[in-house]
A protein has these predicted regions:
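Signal peptide processing junction and immediate N-terminal pro/mature segment
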Residues: 27-35
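Pocket-lining segment of extracytoplasmic ligand-binding domains
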Residues: 188-288
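Bacterial N-terminal signal peptides
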Residues: 16-26
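Short, solvent-exposed loop/beta-turn-alpha elements that line the ligand-binding surface or hinge
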Residues: 67, 227-238, 304-318
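Conserved C-terminal helix/tail region of periplasmic/extracytoplasmic solute-binding proteins
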Residues: 325-369
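Bacterial N-terminal signal peptides that target proteins for export
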Residues: 3-17
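Short, glycine-/small- and polar/acidic-enriched structural segments
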Residues: 34-184, 188, 202-208, 219, ...
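Secondary-structure end/capping motifs
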Residues: 253-337
């Protein structure tokens, strides 16, 4: 069976749940911790997936998953836990086998005694741009000038806000010294554009496609480029692991062969991504990836986000992991339920070298050139 990997936050929930039900019906109960061998000899891996990533879609459409004997079954986390950001407990309980999500979730898990590990990095840069309104760019030349400014950087539990605050703190400016604005996700681009015209926003931290839309307005300029490993290292001192493949230590120990085969498939996929243009990548994505989407806009999005993908090396460096840990531990987050989940727990339980396992990706990178 060839499952289309389409579950994500932007996807219609009813359709997502329907897909999961069909998947589980095809393979039987997915409640056991061990992977299940399907009738066509593919090993089922139950995975929670953030958005609709091209890497998993390509791994499927290019045949790399099948080549490694792997079948990914998307799982709706909200059927297992109250929020889709709480993947640590289902992972540690064996309700799911893997999660395609941001590396920082390993830190939150460690804080709450729900240990998970990252076994491969997909994006080694956050894919963000810190921008300054042109009307004040002569006054805001670095994060040291954030004091007293209005800053739009999304929800205050999110990574955009974490990185903005980290830059400010490193420059000696506490988060309390500037004002977060335009926090609502719905209609955010329109709100920021309006705020720029009205002089109500000074600094912005966003990802694509919002970044391009703001830059194309000619009302903002780039202050910090965090879209590639090189540019991120220049700003923050190291790469910043973002989307990664996450698993529980128990699953890794119990099913090393499955982990290796899955990592092999994703390393092959990353080699493909690294070697092709956005247009070439789009040609190899399944047709339904573009359902209800503007194809040209999607290709532009792929093109603009390609720099954030790890190139050649998909392992975790101690310096990169330390950077994410430092940024998270320096963040106050907000008072929302998700913010408090991320803020609470014990920092002393976070051991950076226990947040990742490079064995599988090192082996795959050596074998797959």
């Amino acid at each position: 069976m060839n499952l289309s990997i389409t579950f994500g936050k932007a996807m219609n929930k009813a359709l997502a749940v329907s897909l999961i039900v069909m998947a589980l019906a095809s393979f039987g109960s997915a409640s056991a911790a061990a992977p299940v061998a399907a009738s066509d000899k593919l090993t089922q891996v139950r995975m929670s997936i953030d958005e609709d990533p091209i890497v998993l879609r390509l791994a499927d459409s290019l045949g790399y998953l099948k080549r490694e004997g792997i079948e990914i079954v998307p799982v709706d986390l909200e059927q297992l836990t109250k929020q889709d950001y709480l993947m640590q407990e289902p992972l540690t309980k064996g309700q799911i086998d893997a999660s395609y999500h941001w590396f920082n979730h390993t830190i939150f898990g460690a804080r709450h005694e729900l240990p998970i590990k990252a076994v491969m990095v997909i994006n080694d840069a956050p894919g963000m741009t810190v921008m300054v309104a042109n009307r004040v760019k002569d006054k805001i030349r670095s994060a040291a000038d954030f004091k007293g400014k209005n800053i739009a950087d999304g929800a205050q539990y999110g990574t955009k806000a974490v990185i903005t605050s980290y830059l400010a703190k490193k420059a000696g400016v506490p988060p309390s010294a500037f004002t977060p604005v335009m926090l609502e996700s719905e209609g955010r681009l329109e709100a920021v554009l309006r705020g720029l015209k009205e002089g109500k926003v000074d600094v912005m931290t966003f990802q694509e496609p919002v970044t391009s839309a703001l830059l194309e307005s000619n009302m903002v300029s780039t202050l910090y480029d965090l879209n590639s490993k090189a540019s991120t290292t220049k700003v923050l001192g190291a790469a910043f692991p973002a989307q990664s493949l996450l698993m529980s230590p128990k699953y890794i120990e119990a099913h090393p062969d499955t982990v290796q085969h899955l990592v092999n498939a994703l390393v092959r996929t990353m080699r493909f991504v690294n070697a092709h243009t956005a247009e070439e990548i789009a040609e190899r994505l399944p047709a339904d990836y573009f359902d209800k989407k503007d194809r040209l806009k999607e290709i532009k999005l792929i093109r603009n986000t390609l720099p954030s993908y790890a190139k050649g090396d998909y392992s975790f460096s101690p310096s990169a992991v330390k950077l994410v840990v430092d940024a998270i531990q320096a963040s106050d987050f907000d008072k929302s339920e998700e913010g408090q989940w991320r803020a609470t727990g014990e920092n002393s339980k976070v051991k950076a070298d226990r947040l990742y396992d490079n064995r599988f990706v090192h082996k795959a990178m050596q074998a797959i050139k």
